[in-house]
Design a protein with these regions (language model features):
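Structural preference for alpha-helix termini/caps and helix-kink/transition segments
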Residues: 82, 90-250
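Alpha-helical recognition segments enriched in aromatics with Gly/Pro capping
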Residues: 1-145
Length: 250
């Protein structure tokens, strides 16, 4: 609450001697008019003592909850070592975007649960790029298939239709489970696998129910974009961007 002044430091006079307010009380003072906060974020290293002190101070002063939800992120690591300026192993966003598209960086970050540490390496970014390529290739091929004029009344296998119907709920459930973006992306790839299976089967691909599934797939991609900020670009244009980016790195 109160830091005693050391020689040469700024200070205020108080009943407890010369000093200044502590770091923790600053946050409580600034946030007081807005309590309770909907979401309070920060790194895991701030849980103790900073956030615990914020809670103690704010709840004692205001007789109300400080925050409804706490979001504590894990650390970015480089080759399994914490990224930090002191170690000289940090990368800026500008550095990364010299070699990768912004969407690839976003995909990489969302591929891990936000509370987990994430290891930044060139290999992990390359894997994120390959995964993006799989999704956009499926979107592109689905669009090409839908451009055909003739469709037959060929039903989807029941197990495929049932699995397809359950996947959006699984996607939503993942995000509702402490914003588990990694699990949500897993549901995206489950849908990509079904679409690829459909596209590889000429009989299913030509069916009206197959057409409906492909149309639904493209619509779901727009929903993923709203929720995650991914997969909303024109597939053909994005695949061309990926190729250009890879060529620049080569």
């Amino acid at each position: 609450l109160w830091k005693a002044a050391k020689p040469g430091e700024p200070f205020w006079e108080s009943p407890w001697g010369k000093g200044r307010l502590g770091w923790h009380i600053e946050c409580s003072a600034m946030s007081q008019p807005y309590l309770p906060l909907d979401i309070h974020g920060g790194g895991q290293d701030l849980i103790f003592p900073h956030h615990e002190n914020e809670i103690a101070q704010s709840e004692a002063a205001c007789a109300c909850s400080l925050a409804r939800y706490w979001v504590h992120n894990g650390f970015v690591q480089v080759n399994a070592e914490k990224m930090s300026k002191s170690l000289g192993n940090f990368k800026t966003i500008r550095d990364i975007l010299e070699n990768y598209l912004p969407e690839t960086l976003r995909f990489f970050l969302l591929g891990k649960h936000y509370r987990s540490p994430i290891d930044f390496t060139a290999d992990s970014m390359d894997e994120a790029e390959k995964a993006q390529h799989r999704v956009f290739t499926a979107l592109h091929e689905a669009g090409k298939a839908l451009a055909r004029d003739k469709w037959k009344k060929t039903p989807l296998p029941q197990e495929m239709a049932e699995e397809w119907a359950t996947l959006p709920k699984a996607f939503d459930a993942a995000l509702e489970d402490d914003i588990n973006t990694a699990q949500a992306l897993g549901q995206v790839f489950a849908q990509v696998r079904l679409v690829n299976r459909l596209l590889e089967d000429k009989g299913l691909r030509a069916g009206e129910t197959g057409r409906d599934l492909l149309q639904d797939f493209l619509a779901r991609a727009q929903e993923w974009n709203k929720r995650l900020g991914l997969f909303g670009q024109d597939p053909q244009a994005f695949l061309a961007e990926l190729r250009s980016q890879r060529a620049r790195r080569a």
